[in-house]
């Protein structure tokens, strides 16, 4: 095993080959799930992927198609209500 693969920043995937041997394939770990910028709640609709994988996805698959995709729906509603109330007053 190469010294670079000894660290746990590489995920170890055990793969059975057609010859019946089990070998280790090393993969980079997936990044953490995206979180809301205000409350920190995990965001739905945003895939966990390394930059190389994310680059291959179309823009609509990378983030929600709505205003303020970096916020969860609850926080987005709060912000929009505050903005509208500020305009009215």
UniProtKB/Swiss-Prot annotation:
GO terms for molecular function: structural constituent of ribosome. The keyword Cytoplasm does not apply. Belongs to the eukaryotic ribosomal protein eL34 family. The keyword Kinase does not apply. InterPro entries: Ribosomal_eL34, Ribosomal_eL34_C_sf, Ribosomal_eL34_CS, Ribosomal_L34e_arc-type. NCBIfam families: PRK04059.1. Keywords: Ribonucleoprotein, Ribosomal protein. This is Large ribosomal subunit protein eL34. Part of the 50S ribosomal subunit. Residues 45-71 are annotated as: Disordered. GO terms for biological process: translation. One of its GO terms (cellular component) is ribonucleoprotein complex. Gene3D superfamilies: 6.20.340.10.
